[in-house]
Amino acid sequence: LILGQLQPDEGSVKLGTKLEIAYSDQLRGKLEPEQNLIDNVCGGQEFIELNGKRRHAISYLGDFLFSPERVRTPVKALSGGEQNRAILARLFSKPANLLVLDEPTNDLDIETLELLEDILLSFDGTVILVSHDRDFMDHVVTQLLILRGDGTVEEQAGGYSDWEARGGRLVEPETRVQQMPASKPETPAPVAASPASTA
């Protein structure tokens, strides 16, 4: 609904007039394998604008652990971890005050995961993420929205461990199937987390 990909069954969704959304799904978009990093991430431009400030593309890519020698490398020659960092660099190169991330830790190496945590902790905006990575949520979120199979949403302050310490518990898939009437389809119970600030 926030992304405008679905329409509400009832009522309406109002978004702020200055809302700028950046979205990354589990598939994370595709990079052009024949193009180099600067072409893929910065549109081939030597400079990019981030939060009203002009940055050199090589300096910006350095924030994502790329050496100046690697920025002209075709994407097809990059490792999987480097490609994931390139996708993150492209995502964060776009102006945004709301990030929507769907399973952002899938297939990330430790170095890239730590980089993502640092970026999210310093992000000046709101982050809505869907994740089953409990450790990651403990590091980056300040609030949880637990989506239940019956359509209810439970809101809790803190990360996953905080919720668990207060007695929170996810129903395991086998248990959930046994508890549901046969006429209802099984619905997964993803955990959605939202950091500090609100849009």
Annotate each PLM feature.
Residues L1-A199:
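ABC ATP-binding cassette signature C-motif
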